Amino acid sequence: LYEIIGQDRAIKALQFGLDIKEEGFNLYVAGMPGTGKKTAIVTYLEQKAKEMSVPSDWCYVYNFEDGQKPNALQLPAGMGSQLVADMARFIEEMKKALKASFESDDYASRREETLKGFEDKKQELMNELNQKAQDAGFVIQRSQIGMVIIPVINGQLINEEQFSILPQSIREEIQDRRKALSDEMRTAFRQFRDIDREAEADVEKFNKEVASFAMDALLDGLNDKYGEVVECKLYLGAVREDILENLGAILGAQKPPENPLAAMMGGGVPDPTRRYKVNLVVDNSKLEGAPVIMEQNPGHDRVFGTTEKEARFGALVTDYTMIRGGSAHMANGGFLILPIEDLARNPGTYEALKRTLLNKKLEIEELAARMGYVSTRSLRPEPIPFDCKVIIVGDGRYYYMLYQGDPEFKKIFKVKAEFNSTMERTQENVEQYAQFMCNLANKEGLKHLEQTGIASVVEYSSRLASDQDKLSTQFATVSDIIREANYYAESNGSEYITEDHV
């Protein structure tokens, strides 16, 4: 159970394939069912993995330049979960700090003071315009459709009917003066708009200063902790800029919803701070060494991840927080073991595996979209670099089918380790067989075998091998015999498993 017995050639091939770093030296481990190759390989890899370094954590974060292409963020093992918690805490503290700052009396008075200067400028312009209108014999009045220029004759406002009965020469002279005043008024209104834009820019600048003061202390703590990771520092800088550009939405989202029912049903205005969350897809915080992942159900999404969706008002929606990694993500930096029989039932997984190994990149892509069944636009997460030894385990017949029928297979699975169904019946191998029986008893809490029991199992193994000079390596079958013998030993109240029980 703890070492590979009687498979010297397979061990050498396994060691070679695992140690060589060049491209394409992944392994196909062939052998009959029941030879214990899966268990032996996992045990062997787990021992080797302990000597290797723990790989990085991986997160997906919002891409502020293109929301459809989430960015992948690499962090030292254990820091991914910390960043998730720290950003969640930052979001809540940031919202509270902004709310307190923008609802303070000091902010209100300083904003009013800033705006008053611009209102004074506009009033001064309006006074000048009114004076020009008065000098030209007009009054400017505000109506429902805008500003209206009304003529004044002998101190009286003249309406359209009165204007129409004036002599033509007087009407023409009034129209000339009105046109000149209209030009003056258009110029003044352009100045009004310029003042409004200047006021808006000044208020926006002031708001950013207030927001920066409120949240920079929070961000400084994050930068101190994660600043050595360049991508993380850039991400935190992008978060800061996005908050400053979306202050109105962030502050507005904290107000009670206008439609409580829609909010309860998941509708209404989306939370603008959701995109500052961090989605941890690979968490290696609990690893001690490299990962060893045995994927028994190698469906496409289970191996290569997926983007989940949720229903909102009858429509399926998704975002980067719903990206889920697969077993290939979990095994990245270590070892991924796939059974060929199950892989053969999932051709989409096999094709994706080849692309991943050839491109050295992990891409999360919907299988339906890849095959053209779905035309709607979906997320395209940034690929993650893939550095992993892939070990396919299964019948040798599949190996030859793939080797002869798939030109790409031989480029990416260059090492074959074959587990023989028999081994020589040497004294050393018999002793290893006895050690195997002892380990099985210890692991499963079975009774130990005395010498006659061990001898009987060895003889049974030779019968399985159909050769007195050989021993069978079908350890699954041999293990079942020992388990059955243990039942009879317990039934008879025997302390050990004997020849009779076997």
Outline where the language-model segments fall.
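Non-catalytic accessory segments flanking P-loop/AAA+ NTPase cores
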Residues: 1-502
